């Protein structure tokens, strides 16, 4: 990943733009989780209901504490969140702080989070200094984009797209409730 390209992605996030970037299985769309105006643009772009909420990805646990009600988590549960597996990513559903935008949590009192070591996500979050929203690069109910060219065809000039390749995983991350173990999405 070129440093100049990463700087353009960080600039886009700081200036309220939607970005597209390679993730573990598909290209993802993302934005600043503290910018409701941009989150609303993302919902519109994807034709997605706000009620579903979004996943936040980060390179480490500490950056997520602004959004997680971690007083409801044990030390062991916090360690579980911090474990990351690049090839088999897991998204955790955890209690959200009351101040988190409903555009992120949707109709829930919880928030979906994932810590990633995947090069592109890790570098974006490390250099941006906070987590970003992560949602598959697609219109709701359509197949997700797997390449930069597919993103360009589907979203034209609506997003700033990062060069790179996904890991090629054919399955999305497992989504699991950390408190009760419920699996929302399996492999």
Swiss-Prot record:
Main subcellular location: cytoplasm
GO BP of this protein: regulation of translational fidelity; tRNA threonylcarbamoyladenosine modification
EC number annotated for this UniProt entry: 2.7.7.87
Molecular function per GO: ATP binding; double-stranded RNA binding; L-threonylcarbamoyladenylate synthase; tRNA binding
Reaction equation(s) it catalyzes: L-threonine + hydrogencarbonate + ATP = L-threonylcarbamoyladenylate + diphosphate + H2O
Domain YrdC-like: 3-187
Domain of life: Bacteria
Classification via Pfam families: Sua5_yciO_yrdC (PF01300)
Entry's localization field: Cytoplasm
InterPro entries: DHBP_synth_RibB-like_a/b_dom, Sua5-like_dom, TC-AMP_synthase, TC-AMP_synthase_SUA5
Keywords: ATP-binding, Cytoplasm, Nucleotide-binding, Nucleotidyltransferase, Transferase, tRNA processing
Coiled-coil regions listed: none
GO cellular component: cytoplasm
Matching HAMAP family: TsaC
Family the UniProt entry places it in: Belongs to the SUA5 family. TsaC subfamily.
Reported function: Required for the formation of a threonylcarbamoyl group on adenosine at position 37 (t(6)A37) in tRNAs that read codons beginning with adenine. Catalyzes the conversion of L-threonine, HCO(3)(-)/CO(2) and ATP to give threonylcarbamoyl-AMP (TC-AMP) as the acyladenylate intermediate, with the release of diphosphate.
Protein name: Threonylcarbamoyl-AMP synthase
Organism, as annotated: Riesia pediculicola (strain USDA)
Highest classification ranks of the organism: Bacteria, Pseudomonadati, Pseudomonadota, Gammaproteobacteria, Enterobacterales
Annotated gene: tsaC
């Amino acid at each position: 990943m070129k440093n100049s390209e990463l700087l353009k992605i960080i600039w886009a996030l700081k200036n309220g733009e939607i970005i597209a970037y390679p993730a573990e299985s598909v290209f993802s769309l993302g934005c600043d989780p503290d910018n409701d105006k941009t989150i609303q643009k993302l919902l519109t772009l994807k034709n997605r209901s706000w009620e579903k909420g979004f996943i936040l990805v980060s390179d480490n646990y500490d950056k997520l504490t602004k959004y997680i009600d971690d007083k409801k988590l044990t030390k062991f549960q916090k360690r579980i969140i911090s474990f990351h597996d690049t090839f088999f990513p897991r998204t955790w559903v955890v209690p959200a702080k009351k101040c988190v935008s409903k555009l992120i949590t949707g109709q829930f009192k919880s928030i979906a989070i994932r810590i990633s070591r995947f090069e592109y996500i890790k570098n974006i979050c490390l250099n941006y200094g906070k987590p970003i929203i992560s949602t598959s690069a697609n219109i709701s109910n359509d197949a997700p984009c797997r390449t930069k060219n597919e993103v360009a065809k589907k979203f034209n000039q609506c997003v700033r797209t990062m060069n790179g390749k996904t890991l090629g995983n054919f399955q999305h991350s497992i989504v699991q409730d950390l408190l009760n173990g419920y699996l929302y999405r399996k492999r």
